[in-house]
Regions:
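N-terminal, polar/charged subdomain of small-to-medium soluble alpha/beta proteins
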Residues: 1-28, 36-52, 56-130
Length: 130
């Protein structure tokens, strides 16, 4: 359950930012999740709520946005957002070098591909109360 570890990092980063800004409370934040990251949103929300108890983050509104996965072809430069199934998504999360096993460039047929977007997790907005 890597959602708990992710939530710990997010809570720690948000609390640190709140301290630096002199905030009494963090009222709202938006997390952007890459769709290839393989994060279960409801588990992440649960972990965030639990880890926020008794902190300036408790009760904050949590908004989650998804970033579509994007793949780029090193051969012709074409970029697209492929449709991948859950098995492929999980494999790509842990071993992105397996991308050529699942996809070919729809323009030139190359397997020389790279993930250009849809990986990672970041706080994309934050509202504080001072």
């Amino acid at each position: 359950m890597h959602e708990w570890a992710i939530a710990e990092g997010v809570v720690e980063a948000l609390l640190e930012r709140g301290r630096k800004e002199g905030a009494r409370r963090i009222t709202r934040f938006t997390l952007t999740l890459g769709e290839i990251q393989g994060v279960e949103e409801e588990l992440l929300r649960l972990a965030l709520r639990e880890l926020s108890r008794g902190t300036p983050l408790e009760g904050a509104e949590i908004k989650v946005e998804r970033e579509r996965g994007r793949v780029g072809c090193r051969g012709c430069g074409f970029e697209w957002s492929p449709e991948v199934g859950s098995e492929e998504e999980e494999a790509l999360h842990f071993l992105p070098d397996l991308l050529p096993l699942f996809l070919r460039c729809p323009r030139c047929g190359s397997v020389d591909l790279e993930i250009k977007g849809g990986r990672g997790i970041w706080v994309s907005s934050l509202e504080l109360e001072k």
